[in-house]
Amino acid sequence: MSRPVALIGPQGAGKTTLAELLVEHRGYRRHGIADGIRRVLQMAYRDGVAKGETIELQRFSGKVTLTGRELMQEIGMAVRDVDLHFWLRVWSQGYSELWQAGVPVVVDDVRLPSEVQMLRVLEPKIIVVRVHADAEVRRERRAGVYTGNGDITETGWEGAAFDATIDTTAVTVQEAYAALVAAIDGGSENV
């Protein structure tokens, strides 16, 4: 079975694009840490809330408007305040099922050093790849839209340990993907 992969980095660096290529070309399945948060949102808000969509909520302090991404961040952090590893515990249940079925997994939403540490405990063979791009390139890719930038999940990844780095600033998607495959297959490819 192929080695599990965790992709870590800022918004717009190319993590999801690389994950989608692993799914398409190598039979991986995306299994995100935030999938559990999405399921909670779907239970409360029938169709869920898209990352860029806005939603008006009533709080004790009054009404507030949040994007779907901000709502996910707040729910994620509120539960992490109770149990730092709660969402990883939820993730590990699904991971175990995939592993037992022989399905390789890519996680493209690793955000915190504690998540990397716990992933390594749960799956010692996992390769953690830092995906990076210059801020201007990321801004352009996201059409200038960043949401939830003040959240720890948007900056916490910087302190996480990783096994390889792919800087997507000046390389093609194909070059970045080739570097990722080389890292997975045992090369120490850093682009």
Where are the regions that the model predicts?
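P-loop (Walker A) phosphate-binding loop of NTP-binding proteins
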Residues: 10
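ATP-dependent small-molecule kinase phosphotransfer cores
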Residues: 35-104
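Hydrophobic positions on the alpha1 helix immediately C-terminal to the Walker A/P-loop
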Residues: 18
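Post-Walker A helix-loop "phosphate-sensing" segment adjacent to the P-loop in P-loop NTPases
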Residues: 24-31
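Small-molecule kinase domains that catalyze NTP-dependent phosphoryl transfer to phosphate-bearing small molecules
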Residues: 66, 130-187, 191
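ATP-dependent NMP and nucleoside kinases share a basic, alpha-helical "lid"
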Residues: 90-142
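Conserved lysine of the Walker
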Residues: 15
